[in-house]
A protein has these predicted regions:
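Chalcogenol-based redox active-site neighborhoods
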Residues: 1-125
Length: 125
């Protein structure tokens, strides 16, 4: 039996739809973001150094993205409680390149079933 492999959506293609639990409550993607640009970005794991610095940078730039009518949505296959603990650690304990006490206010999707990651071609079959 051949396994279906999803590829990353290309510019101009319809974004795969999903509902998901996030650190900011449930989202219905992409319907909740109608009329806005969205950057849906993923990271391999919470509490990793590069992912932490990337999240801190995105969070400090969120106002600029909002001014450009662009929303940020993060995704990983970690669970919600891991996400919450990681974001709390970023805010309370991490300092990087002059950034500290950084609060991440954009949603971070819990995807422990890998459903969303697979829809977006982010996982190997």
């Amino acid at each position: 039996m051949e396994e279906k492999v999803n590829s990353m959506p290309r510019i101009g293609e319809k974004a795969p739809e999903f509902k998901a639990v996030t650190t900011q409550g449930e989202i219905n993607f992409p319907a909740d973001y109608k009329g806005s640009w969205v950057i849906l970005f993923s990271h391999p794991a919470d509490f990793t150094p590069v992912c932490t610095s990337e999240f801190m940078t995105f969070a400090t730039m969120e106002k600029q993205f909002n001014e450009a009518n662009c929303k940020l949505v993060g995704l990983s296959v970690d669970g919600l409680y891991s996400h919450i603990a990681w974001l709390r650690t970023i805010k309370e304990k991490i300092e990087y390149k002059g950034m500290k006490n950084v609060e991440v206010t954009f949603p971070l999707i819990e995807d422990i079933t890998m459903e969303v990651a697979q829809k977006y071609g982010m996982m190997m079959p």
